[in-house]
């Protein structure tokens, strides 16, 4: 079982958030352990001080090194991976979340105020992770994003064994649109193929629609996906289909105007496939 210890000045933010939904069920089922710890328990003064002014001046306070270090030492062991949530870190990706889910023990450090002392980072932190190119008031939300993202790759956490593998980004593509009852709603009909019962046909259709959605919404990801598909295509001795982009264009042409609309693909045109 993956054990996660979160070091934060606001442990109630962590414990409250992980007690609901999928994470809450994972904790109850002993598939995952999340505990929050505060440096305040090691503060020796009557005000339980955990921050101080930075040397050289500047805006914001810095978390005190001594109390933070003791918090780290309390939970760290030889198999721990210590992560500092920081806007300077590498951006969290689906692959990174999957990698972290394989760890034995994670220690997530949540900064506050102006951050933490660089010497703590130099000595204890194995990796800095960011959840995006923006700044938050603390690392707690980032830690929760990391926990939620990695938990989806832990066997048994999601209701369906294939759920994580079919989510957006799992194969380098965004997820296809999903529909439920009623069949017709807001003047839009569910695509007929999804009602066919032909599982192979549906799976192939969903993959191509995912590619089209990625082309429209994340062309940067589509370029990477297309390069990989072209490499696979070149390796084939017997080519039963057209070149990947041409094959996708052909599929798009065969979609009815109604299907393009309900799938949110009506903005694509022939120029979209010039790549």
Curated annotation (Swiss-Prot):
Annotated CDD domains: TrmD-like (cd18080)
Domain of life: Bacteria
Parts of the chain that traverse the membrane: none
Similarity field: Belongs to the RNA methyltransferase TrmD family.
Family annotation (InterPro entries): Alpha/beta_knot_MTases, tRNA_m1G_MeTrfase_C_sf, tRNA_m1G_MeTrfase_TrmD, tRNA_m1G_MTases_N, tRNA_MeTrfase_TRMD/TRM10
A cellular component term, taken from the record's GO annotations: cytosol
Family annotation (PANTHER family): TRNA (GUANINE-N(1)-)-METHYLTRANSFERASE (PTHR46417:SF1)
This protein's UniProt keywords: Cytoplasm, Methyltransferase, S-adenosyl-L-methionine, Transferase, tRNA processing
Major localisation: cytoplasm
GO molecular function terms attached to this record: tRNA (guanine(37)-N1)-methyltransferase activity
Species this chain originates from: Bdellovibrio bacteriovorus (strain ATCC 15356 / DSM 50701 / NCIMB 9529 / HD100)
Name of the protein in its database record: tRNA (guanine-N(1)-)-methyltransferase
Catalytic activity as recorded in UniProt: guanosine(37) in tRNA + S-adenosyl-L-methionine = N(1)-methylguanosine(37) in tRNA + S-adenosyl-L-homocysteine + H(+)
EC number of the protein: 2.1.1.228
Quaternary state and interactors: Homodimer.
Higher taxonomy: Bacteria, Pseudomonadati, Bdellovibrionota, Bdellovibrionia, Bdellovibrionales
Location(s) in or outside the cell: Cytoplasm
